[in-house]
Amino acid sequence: MVKIRLKRTGRKKLPFYQIVAADSRAPRDGKFLEIVGHYQPTAKPHAVTIKKDRVSYWMQTGAQPTDTVRSLIRSTGLLHELRLRSLGRSEADITAEMEKWQQNQTERRQKRLAVKTRRRQAKKAAEAKGAEA
């Protein structure tokens, strides 16, 4: 069975992963069929590049992504796009839906950032108040 999974590269304490299509019996960093993307978890925010056409090809031929790779693919919107294609939607519908999805993701990121900012400010205010007393 073919799996789409992470292959670790990089150096000690600074991981860099290649997203590869590989036989499930092959070792993690061993033989693979094709490199379909890269993932750099140490970058802020995490850097993910995926060859969408190759990932969709491998998934249509039966390759199963691992849990981590599935979440990375989901974060790029490719799973949503593949689902729409499997439902037989037209290209115009898919494009419109993906734009809507992208806008929704941007709004969610902004909300999360606003919550983090409020929490930081509240923590600083509490520390300043504690320092006065």
UniProtKB/Swiss-Prot annotation:
PROSITE patterns: RIBOSOMAL_S16 (PS00732). NCBIfam families: S16. The gene is rpsP. It comes from Chlorobium limicola (strain DSM 245 / NBRC 103803 / 6330). This is Small ribosomal subunit protein bS16. It holds the Pfam family Ribosomal_S16. It comes from the Bacteria. Belongs to the bacterial ribosomal protein bS16 family. SUPFAM superfamilies: Ribosomal protein S16. The keyword Lipid metabolism does not apply. InterPro entries: Ribosomal_bS16, Ribosomal_bS16_CS, Ribosomal_bS16_dom_sf. GO terms for biological process: translation. Residues 124-133 have a biased composition (Basic and acidic residues).
